[in-house]
């Protein structure tokens, strides 16, 4: 397992697991992997044939990946979920989790440009490879 860094503490973790009603042989997607808290809990409930695909467009999340054969990290925006699932040969899923919003990780990193606490460039991109940052949008 990759070393987990302090990134984000998942909110409503137990409620999310109850809502997903995870089947041991099910296929699940976490479209906002981030720190991996929700995904780690999903994997705990999967049997040998269960699968979890976790997406994030922020490559910082890759450092939190889970070293488990039932887990696949997908670098991308969940707007392309259908394309990614087709790529991996997934015909249907049993549940999708989306923990939308900004994590503490983004506010605590002055280079990300999400916080008013730091002097810095107004970036605010979840995907640092995106063409335009927030400063460009408001200019």
Cite the ranges covered by each PLM segment:
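S-adenosyl-L-methionine-dependent methyltransferase catalytic core, i.e., the SAM/SAH-binding region
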Residues: 1-139
């Amino acid at each position: 397992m990759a070393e987990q860094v302090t990134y984000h503490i998942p909110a409503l973790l137990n409620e999310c697991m109850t809502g997903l009603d995870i089947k041991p042989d099910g296929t699940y997607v976490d479209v906002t992997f981030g720190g991996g808290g929700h995904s780690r809990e999903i994997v705990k409930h999967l049997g040998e044939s269960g699968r979890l695909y976790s997406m994030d467009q922020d490559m910082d999340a890759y450092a939190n990946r889970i070293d488990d054969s039932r887990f696949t990290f997908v670098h991308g925006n969940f707007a392309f979920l259908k394309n990614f699932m087709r790529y991996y040969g997934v015909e249907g899923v049993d549940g999708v989790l989306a923990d939308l919003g900004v994590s503490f990780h983004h506010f605590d990193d002055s280079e990300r440009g999400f916080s008013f606490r730091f002097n810095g460039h107004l970036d605010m991109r979840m995907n640092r490879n995106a063409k335009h940052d927030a400063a460009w949008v408001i200019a």
